Amino acid sequence: MKKHRWILMMSILFLCPSLCLAAPAKVEVVPAVTAEAAVVMDMDTGEVLYGKHEHEQRPPASLTKVMTGYLAVKQGRLQQTVTVSETAASTGESSLNLKTGDQLTFENLLYGALMKSANDACVALAEQMAGSEAVFVQNMNLQACLLGCSNTNFCNSNGLPAENHYSSAYDLAVMTRAAMQEELFAHIVQQQKYRVRWSDGRHLLVQNTNRLLREYPGAIGVKTGTTNEAGQCLIAVAEKEGKRIIVVVLKSKNRFYDAVALLDYGLSAERKSGILNNRTETGQLSASA
């Protein structure tokens, strides 16, 4: 009887060699991140490659400035001179330290807003474009709606804490995807340094707050954001071999570490950059930087 069983088993194996040769199923390793919400999006197709509470409404801090910058570059008033109002000059936290009556070109304010995360520059731009920040915010929300961002409501142009001011990781990726189609926006957010110039000859060298531009091969933008309520936030874009990936992380314990893990995941499952270790960023939080 045992001999017959052995012959039967050998016959089955002989007739079905695929049973022996079948490779084990490949298990995709999803990156572990500290962010409470995150998304990875293919910038060319809009496909979501990874999501973690990506539709959850959260304070976006200075990631708000992506929409402000997007609307600004679409208006194309680059060489127009802007006179800084008292309202803009009094806007606190991260800023260019603008004074009432200062004059700068629209372009210089735009660089200050997107690279240095200057809150005062955002208000000056908003007032120049729409007459008041309140009216400009209506335009921001309209544009968000047109892009299909259903979990977004802006209350100001810079992302400073405000009741009912929120967005989601997914919506912010959608906004970034649209903004990066604008050549000037894509150029500005990729710059590491820029000298902001006032009309009277004063100038200020600003450095991009996005350190991935200096540390992650292929990084081409976009924006940092930090408030006590929002935590560490970041939108990052990188490209490799023709593939472009958008990463958004919200309320992260280490936004740059999380972004690297998600960019690596989106660009190539095998790629290991190893440029950032898993250390939590510490220090005073600068509101909406």
Predicted segment positions?
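Soluble, non-transmembrane domains of envelope/secretory-pathway proteins that act on or interact
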Residues: 1-2, 113, 287-289
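Sec-dependent N-terminal signal peptides of Gram-positive bacterial secreted proteins and lipoproteins
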Residues: 4-23
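Sterically constrained small-residue positions within well-ordered secondary structures
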Residues: 13, 29-31, 238
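Domain-terminus/edge residues, biased toward the C-terminal soluble/receptor-binding domains
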Residues: 149-153, 161-289
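Non-catalytic cell-wall polysaccharide-engagement segments
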Residues: 19, 139, 209
